[in-house]
Amino acid sequence: MDAITPKGTLKADEHSHVVRPADMDWKPTRFPGCEVKTLLMDPKTGIMTALMRFAPGAVLPDHEHVNIEQTYVLEGRLVDKEGPAEGIEAKQGEFIWREPGSRHSAWTPEGGLMLAIFQIPNKFYEKDGRVTDSSGQIWDEVWGRIGKD
């Protein structure tokens, strides 16, 4: 994060961080057809900004946005597959944000590329009843403390 530094005590590279996504490799996620380039991740707060690339037909399964989630669609479209907003879609050049507590699954019929901003990682609802983060860790164990310290 960037902030005004009192009396200019820090060098530019100590408070401004340039990320070069073109020089980064796509990392697979546990969700088939979904890859990510993490541009910012703060493990203390859960804030994350990522480029997400989806293959045609890829599904992001049942999940809840614990806080506001923001997505800008760079390519393709993102469609709610299930949930209260089933069928709503954001197309290339459109921006969609979701309120805290919103829950759905989403898919990309033709594939897509998104810039996603999370204030805290999503909760994924597994078929066996566990609630996990995107890496498969138990959400409460990793992220449940945030905002309670």
Task: Label every PLM stretch briefly.
Residues 56, 65-83:
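Glycine- and acidic-residue-biased ligand/ion/polar-headgroup-sensing regions
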Residues 81-103:
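Short acidic-glycine-tyrosine-enriched beta hairpin
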Residues 50-52, 60-65, 82, 87-88, ...:
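Short histidine-centered beta-strand/loop micro-motifs
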Residues 34, 49, 68:
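Short coil/loop residues immediately preceding or within conserved phosphate-binding loops
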Residues 100-125:
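Ligand-binding loop in jelly-roll beta-barrel domains
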Residues 44-46, 55-58, 77-79, 102, ...:
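Short, charged/polar surface micro-motifs in flexible loops or helix N-caps
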